[in-house]
Amino acid sequence: MSPSLVANAEAVAPVKSGMIKEPLKVSGALPPDYFEVTSIIGREYPTLQLSELMNSPRRDEYIRDLAITVSERGVVFFRNQKDLTVAMQKEFIDLLGRLSGKPETSGIHIHPLLEGKRDVGINDAGDVDDHISVVSSKLSRKLHLASRYNFASKGWHSDMTFEHVPSDYAILKMRKVPPTGGDTIWASGYEMYDRLSAPYQRFVEGLTAKHANPDFQAAAARVGFEIYPGPRGAAENVGQDLIANHPVVRTNPVTGWKSIYGALNQIEQLNELAPQESQEVLRYLGQLLTNNHDLQCRFKWGVDDVAIWDNRSSFHTGTPDVDVNHIRTGNRAVSMGEVPYLDPMSTSRREALGEAE
């Protein structure tokens, strides 16, 4: 195992199971009105209102159970959340991390391309909030020069992996949707790990990856922004290079399950390998993500719909098919979690659920 992986693991005190962090179990507090989007990833609560959970005397119990559910299912969807305000959205996602064990020093992320300097607001009045990222088809075209000549699969990612303390959970509420298009797709990092043979699993468990996001520097230079030096949601997240090293396989501390971490253009190099070897391994891991539609789920947005996902063990991508005459706009808040680590005592999702072959 890589020395950096061992160092990360030893920084956390073991608990009674022998694992670095004891996995959490739901209490059963949440209502049973839901359905699984696929057998592997995704759950939808068609009637549950997050604002009611926030205002309930059992708030912490509900939100803790929801955090565990999101970590187990990868992403959870909620329809027509018109009463969920921006302030509640930020408080909710921070509580989701805190009630499931994130460090006290981790808060809500501030995007390196400061929200207050962009030309889109969190509401029709144009108000800005540096703790809310406005997801906008218009802004995406401006900053990143989205092109129909690129593969759409280039967009697969987990949020903020270039940070030393990356994201645990994120929440997105859609404000405006086009008549058609703009769906988001999620994929399971747990299942990607489970699709590897045992020897290949052991191989990638010994690797670390250099994560970066040069697109942000390019976008900032293109439109005259400056990268915000931080701190960005955690004291460790400072500087303008936007580079961090993380294990290729990480343990989700909430479930105790192993997941592939980082995808495609997020990773510049596997540190322990020669450049050509690194390219081949990354190519194969990328194919696991893009070529297996049975470890993905797709969500068609309505106005005020909400998605909450676990960035430690899932990937997502928007579908860049919004017509230029229409707009897709939503407000996203991103909680920051812990330094990624691989627990040698952790298991795969299928092994934990008794589904391993």
Describe each model-derived feature in a short phrase.
Residues 2-73, 79-308, 312-357:
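Fe(II)/2-oxoglutarate oxygenase catalytic core
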